[in-house]
Amino acid sequence: MRVEILYTSKSKHIKPVAEAMARWVKTYAKTIDQFDALAPVDLLVIGFDDSAWKDPQLETFIKSLNRQKVHNIALFNAFYINDHKMKNMIKLCQETDLSLMREQYSFKLTFRQLKEIDQCVIDAARLYVEDMVNLVRDYY
């Protein structure tokens, strides 16, 4: 089973979470620019920061994906005030007819976490990716 953990290059808070998730599934976290679109993927996990500005790189990337190469997609993000960007990315995945996993993972950044992500967030991210891998392996 092939699992890819990706994050946007603008995501300074998502990178350590993506790296922890990738270690659990014995792979490496990559930016979306490093993704090999030609190889089929059983589970693609994409992480991003929530911000007030649109992320055209992320939107273009999601629009470029298809069900033949990417069988399942899961999303995770960090947000400050609200998670509107997560809702927009879910909507974009649905409009693009991608196989989006039912559960997504979001965590709220506090002022304390602006320098270092809390260990509880990283542990929860590992549990999330473990659940998604088990779902894909056992049910899809």
Predicted regions and their residues:
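Short amphipathic alpha-helix with an adjacent loop that forms part of the alpha/beta core around
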Residues: Q34-P40
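FMN-binding flavodoxin-like domain, especially the glycine-rich phosphate-binding loop
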Residues: A22-Y28, P40-Y140
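Conserved acidic residues
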Residues: T31
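Short, charged N-terminal beta->alpha structural module
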Residues: M1-K26
